[in-house]
């Protein structure tokens, strides 16, 4: 079988040995959790957050069973300033500093604009765009001490058009703009900021917020005929957080097999 259709899970290379990384929305079984797992496999200590206590506890237990780096976490709703402030304080209390922040929280859905309520629009913008902004704003003063990195999770919908995704696409386009603009503001502090823009990453949340018919159509349009595994997106997040991308800031990498 073509390896592109059946990718091989990578081996760890200690890219983040003794580094401390904060990852938002890291519970469950999507990109956030896969990213947390990959950072551990690369030698990092991690602090994760999520909005659901039960799911967060399960994620922490599962990651600790890997018996790799240190794993801690707390509840955090990225729309709430006080919860974000507490999350960073708890992370610093655990590790004394942070070397990187993975800004993963986001919320999507499927709805045509004509049928969309103000509340539905506002919720996606508040979590996906405003939440990303608030995490970045809180991370900058913390990362000055280590000349750390921020990696945002965007989407190719920030570039591409897709019916039923106007709220999500607008939010992710905003995340891309934040990435580029704020990266210019943090250069003087040695802080790099980049983003990854996945095309189609398979995870349970995708199935909950989109129809099976739409997902099948999207998979058929990818050159590999499949969506990315969540750990394949995590690998790009790791690259952007590592010294391997030391010359890059303000960039958005498309994680896509292009459209067939």
What would you call each of these model-derived segments?
Residues 2-11, 30, 160, 220, ...:
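Short C-terminal tail/terminal secondary-structure segment
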């Amino acid at each position: 079988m073509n390896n592109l259709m059946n990718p091989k899970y990578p081996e760890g290379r200690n890219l983040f040995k003794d580094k401390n990384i904060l990852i938002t929305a890291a519970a469950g079984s999507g990109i956030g959790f896969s990213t947390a797992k990959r950072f551990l496999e690369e030698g990092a200590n991690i602090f994760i957050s999520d909005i659901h206590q039960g799911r967060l506890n399960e994620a922490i237990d599962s990651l600790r069973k890997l018996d790799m780096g240190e794993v801690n976490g707390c509840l955090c709703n990225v729309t709430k300033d006080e919860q974000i402030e507490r999350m960073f304080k708890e992370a610093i209390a655990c590790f004394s500093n942070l070397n990187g922040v993975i800004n993963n929280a986001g919320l999507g859905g499927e709805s045509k604009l004509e049928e969309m309520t103000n509340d539905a629009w506002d919720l996606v913008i508040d979590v996906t765009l405003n939440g990303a902004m608030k995490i970045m704003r809180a991370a900058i003063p913390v990362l000055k001490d280590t000349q750390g990195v921020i990696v945002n999770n965007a989407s190719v919908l920030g570039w591409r058009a897709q019916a039923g995704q106007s709220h999500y696409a607008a939010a992710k386009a905003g995340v891309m703009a934040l990435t580029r603009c704020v990266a210019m503001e943090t250069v003087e502090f040695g802080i790099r900021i980049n983003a990854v823009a996945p095309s189609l990453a398979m995870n349970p949340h995708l199935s909950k917020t989109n129809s099976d018919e739409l997902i099948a159509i999207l998979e058929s349009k990818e050159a590999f005929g499949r969506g990315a595994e969540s750990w394949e997106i995590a690998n790009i997040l790791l690259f952007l957080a590592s010294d391997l991308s030391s010359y890059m800031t303000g960039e958005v990498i498309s994680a896509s097999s292009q459209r067939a």
